[in-house]
């Protein structure tokens, strides 16, 4: 059962249920790990039950640090996915490609919002045209996708 299906089952059966997550070296991310009540046990309304899902393998310290650094670049500098990856793997930051990819795969970022914030900065501080902003956003320097850059241009005057 998916997490959503488990929650619906809890609600429909009036079970005092919770869903938790834990790292697992043997169970793939998102898959079922365990439940607090043994399978085939009759449960009653109001019973407490926890179902646990896997977060996948626990990240290394380097992966955790790369993710924290990526979050900072996203939140403070409104960088693109590609820009963050390039920065993390640069000689300045020195993270491995694997740690940088882990960060990119696990960051909770709104890339379109980042593109918009970066576009506003270019327009306000450098007096750039919309086409110039678009070109800058999609350049190898900034690394936003065409879709992210177009979103930024479309919402620049909102």
Where does each model-flagged region fall?
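Ligand-recognition elements built from short beta-strands and adjacent flexible loops
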Residues: 1-75, 82-86, 90-94, 101-118, ...
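Extracellular glycan-recognition/adhesion modules and their associated mucin-like linkers
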Residues: 74-81, 123-130
